[in-house]
Amino acid sequence: MSRRHRAEKREINPDPKFGDLIVTKFMNAIMLDGKKSVAESIVYGAFDAVQGKAKQEPLGVFHQALDNIAPHVEVRSRRVGGATYQVPVDVRPERRQALAIRWLITAARKRNETTMVDRLCGELLDASNNRGSAVKKREDTHKMADANRAFSHYRW
């Protein structure tokens, strides 16, 4: 962590189609090499595919998926007297959101469909129904925290 000043939070604008800040953050996370228009077409294409397959509001599916992926607790390493303990700590809301977005994108990129639009659509639908590898990642994180509950008194 920096000893100097903390980085300022940047102001981001809501996305043009839905007017949602989280969708903009999601697009920025999907974006590679600064190609925002490509990221935009991937996200909106996936939302259209979700609308077609699930017959539900895509924004609702997206938010449900993020809620199902976001972890409540995680483990952090803490060194005490020569031993390193995995200490379970609560996750701050901003980090919860960031982890959910990151895990969703990673899981979508690992899927086997041909286009990123299809992969993202599949992962969004799976995550909104509490399935898929992004939800499994959250479950594994919670299991780790539960297994190390004995060290929770080392919190800082």
From Swiss-Prot:
Pfam families: Ribosomal_S7
Top-rank taxon, per record: Bacteria
SUPFAM superfamilies for this protein: Ribosomal protein S7
Residue ranges of coiled coil: none
GO cellular component: small ribosomal subunit
Key words of the record: Ribonucleoprotein, Ribosomal protein, RNA-binding, rRNA-binding, tRNA-binding
A GO molecular function held by the record: structural constituent of ribosome
UniProt record, GO biological process: translation
Family listed: Belongs to the universal ribosomal protein uS7 family.
Function recorded in the entry: One of the primary rRNA binding proteins, it binds directly to 16S rRNA where it nucleates assembly of the head domain of the 30S subunit. Is located at the subunit interface close to the decoding center, probably blocks exit of the E-site tRNA.
Assembly, per entry: Part of the 30S ribosomal subunit. Contacts proteins S9 and S11.
Protein name in UniProt: Small ribosomal subunit protein uS7
Species of provenance: Rhizobium rhizogenes (strain K84 / ATCC BAA-868) (Agrobacterium radiobacter)
